[in-house]
Regions:
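Bacterial N-terminal signal peptides
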Residues: 7-16
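Pro/Thr/Ser/Gly-rich low-complexity, intrinsically disordered linker/stalk tracts
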Residues: 525-554, 592-606
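Non-catalytic C-terminal accessory modules of carbohydrate-active enzymes
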Residues: 24-25, 346, 382-543
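Extracytoplasmic
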Residues: 579-580, 598-731
């Protein structure tokens, strides 16, 4: 079998000119990684009828063609060696690193910022921030800083990228800017930058505390970080206001990381009171994440909570959020190890989330994003899971080799980058993830304000000697050599003397670090489950006192939920209901895979619902904008929401989401959001985010006020039309 395989590779290489003489060199026979889809040996990657290899350390060739049928090849074109010279254990290993550095330089814009990808110009807050965390904060800190500075608005707040319903707060992950800002400081020690970044971060967090934070759950609202294509990850019925209400693992993990580094910033800057406050907030959020998202029977954190009046937890795992829970220390040691070994993985890598939504195209859904794979690989190294680290490295090597570039994404169950809805080569966070995973595993980079620690995690099959020469760190040039494999250091010499594998931040000049690994790894595993399909969500109607829906393919039963809790199971497609409440139905497959719940169906007698005509405009004038008197017939819990239109932009574009504070009898209750519902769609009325309040019997004043912290990302255009107020008494 091995002979046949090598003959096939040799034949492929002769036919495509990958080897000058058609000979498979001895080192190419060493197999690094193989599964049923692809093989990675020392100097080539083979998948089906395609192969790729590196003739030199400055060139990668492949039999794969571009999407339009043209040959693919990478050849170095930039001065990459001023960022250090990497020498791996094979020509391909070295060439792939060189390609990532080369593509990093390709993304340098004339204005000193970083381009997002070959096809996408401009700076995106989350793209540059996550790229910074992966490697760019120390590879090109000046470029990252310049990029962060263009994502500050004139009010001194972080700019949220374009997103659902008019950007912030439906999308709320802009705070990852702070993680990048802190990592620039760790890499450079630049106090001037820290002093500039800190007030921008704290002002943004203050707005989020009022508009995004939910004190009832202790979590932050807004769609999953970077997973911002609505129907790609949410049920199709979800309106922008529903997506704002969702509480997501990745976004909350990011907020935790931000609160933690903001406390660290405050401490460095001498703000002891603020440092304590942010540290306490971080600890409270950490507890809330563990309480609300952890699913013991699955061994990982759930992706998000969603709904309207009542919230439901999804069954999904979500790779970026899971990875952050490990990397940021949200998960304790036991949970962290369990997350990496339990979350869903496929042969081409970990999916963005799992299970998949059959009716949706490939992008976030049914997609692998190499930068997320890199975060997952780093998290795997942290918990010392050799199989996961090896799988992450192999999947990144496979795609970069076969397509001779660092793509943004590819299809989860085929590995094809050409079958996703949108993609770009030379992608900033793809290339930064590739470099970052090399740095974390082969050299063990860990930056702190005290200096650079080296804690390599080299898989056994990748044992060998690797060098990173003339690597710039602060006022130093470092020559680093790591030999062997394993997760523990056997010996370390710094400048020829036995020492800890640590370089103090205040050193200057040239230094040599030589590390030999012990060659040991503990047993590890991953959960290779492949493609799992969700059943479709039922579409439910109320008819003669019964909930009714059409049969769902592959459903073995249906669960009926009232006010967020399962109250019945049935194999039929109807359910009698006799009580007032909010009803939902979900399909469950024979393997226990849940669909999304159906759109929440309000079943209330007329006596429980009041609707008052308003016909008012929300505009840019700070202060009270709407005031309505309502008579409440009995004391109890009520849901307040507003019928509104916002035609300032498409659901998926622009930044005109309107946010206002709900005041009842002069007391600030909560933020209510009025997202965009379609460009010029001023007759497309829907409902704002709801607020649950306790009201006593009698007359109350219900008002909407526009406060400075409500101001949207656009600043200049912040309006909506309010048609009516609805108050629903909960039974």
């Amino acid at each position: 079998m091995k002979k046949l395989f090598l003959t096939l590779v040799a034949g492929l290489c002769i036919s495509t000119g990958l080897f000058a003489n058609g000979d498979v060199r001895q080192d190419d026979k060493k197999q690094n990684y193989a599964n049923s889809k692809f093989v990675w040996t020392q100097n080539y990657v083979v998948e089906g009828a395609n192969a790729a290899m590196a003739p030199t350390t400055e060139e990668i060739v492949t039999t794969c063609l571009s999407k339009d049928g043209k040959p693919l090849r990478w050849v170095r074109k930039n001065d990459i060696y001023k960022y250090g010279k990497f020498t791996g254990t094979s020509t391909l290993e070295t060439a792939l690193y060189n390609m990532a550095v080369d593509e990093m330089i390709n993304n340098y814009e004339k204005d000193g910022t970083l381009r997002t990808g070959l096809y996408w110009g401009g700076v995106w807050t989350r793209d540059v921030s996550y790229s910074s965390l992966l490697s760019l904060a120390y590879m090109c800190p000046d470029k990252v800083r310049n990029s962060l500075e263009v994502k500050i608005d004139r009010m001194g707040r972080i700019i949220q990228d374009t997103g659902t319903g008019g950007s912030w707060p439906c999308s709320s992950d802009r705070v990852v800017w702070a993680l990048s800002a802190w990592n620039i400081y760790l890499a450079t020690g630049d106090m001037e930058w820290l002093e500039k970044a800190y007030p921008i971060i704290t002002k943004s967090l203050a707005c989020d505390d009022m508009v995004v934070y939910n004190p009832q759950t202790g979590l932050y609202r807004g769609e999953s970080s970077f997973i911002d294509w609505r129907e790609q990850s949410y049920p199709t019925w979800a309106q922008p206001a529903d997506i704002y209400l969702s509480e997501c693992l990745g976004t909350n993990a990011a907020f935790y990381g931000v609160l933690k580094v903001t406390a660290d910033m405050a401490s460095v800057l001498g703000y002891k009171k603020e440092a304590k406050m942010y540290a306490q907030k971080a600890e409270a959020l950490k507890q809330a994440i563990n309480d609300k998202f952890w699913v013991e029977e699955d061994g990982y954190y759930a992706s998000y909570w969603y709904g309207r009046q009542n919230m439901i937890r999804t069954q999904h795992s979500e790779t970026l959020g899971e990875s952050f829970c490990v990397l940021f220390g949200i998960a304790d040691e036991e949970r962290a190890a369990k997350v990496i070994s339990s979350m869903h993985v496929g042969e081409f890598g970990p999916p963005i989330f799992s299970p998949q939504i059959v009716s949706q195209g490939n992008y976030h859904n049914n997609g692998v994003w190499p930068y997320v794979t890199s975060f997952w690989g780093k998290a795997a190294a942290q918990v010392e899971n050799e199989k996961a680290v090896m799988h992450a490295l192999a999947c990144n090597v496979r795609t970069a080799s076969l397509y001779a570039t660092n793509y943004e994404n590819y299809t989860f169950n085929t590995g094809n980058p050409y079958t996703t809805l949108m993609n770009s080569p030379n992608m900033l966070w793809g290339l930064s993830g590739f470099m970052g995973l090399y740095h974390r595993t082969f050299f063990g980079f860990e930056f702190s304000k005290e200096g650079l620690s080296l804690k390599p995690f080299v898989p056994s099959v990748l044992a060998g000697t690797r060098k990173l020469e003339a690597f710039p760190y602060r006022s130093m040039l470092l020559d680093i050599t790591v030999s062997g494999s394993g997760n523990e250091i056997a010996s370390c010499k710094v400048d020829g003397k036995d020492a800890d594998a640590f370089i103090p931040a205040d050193w200057t000049g040239k230094h040599t670090i030589e590390i030999v690994m012990k060659g040991e790894h503990k047993p590890s595993s991953i959960n290779m489950v492949g493609y799992i399909a969700m059943p479709e969500a039922p579409v439910v109607q109320m008819n003669a006192g019964k909930l009714q829906w059409k049969p769902i393919a592959n459903a073995s039963k249906y669960e009926v939920l009232k006010d967020g809790k399962v109250v019945a199971e049935t194999t039929s497609c109807e359910q009698q209901v006799a009580e007032d409440g909010e009803y939902l139905v979900r399909a469950v497959s024979a393997k226990g895979v849940h669909s999304f719940v159906s759109e929440p169906l309000r079943v209330y007698t007329d006596a429980l619902v009041q609707q008052v005509n308003v016909d008012k405009w929300l505009d840019n004038q700070l202060g009270e904008q709407v005031k309505v008197k309502v008579a409440v017939p009995a004391s109890g819990w009520y849901v307040v929401d507003w019928e509104y239109a916002n035609g300032n932009g498409e659901v998926e574009q622009r930044n005109h989401c309107a946010n206002r504070q709900l005041y009842i009898d002069g007391k600030n209750k909560e933020t209510m959001v009025f997202p965009q519902r379609g460009l010029d769609a001023w007759n497309a009325y829907g409902w704002s985010s709801p607020v649950k309040v306790y009201l006593k019997k009698g007359t109350h004043q219900v008002a909407l006020r526009y406060l400075e912290k409500n101001i949207n990302i656009n600043i200049d255009l912040d309006k909506a039309h309010v048609k009516s107020l609805r108050i629903t008494r909960l039974p």
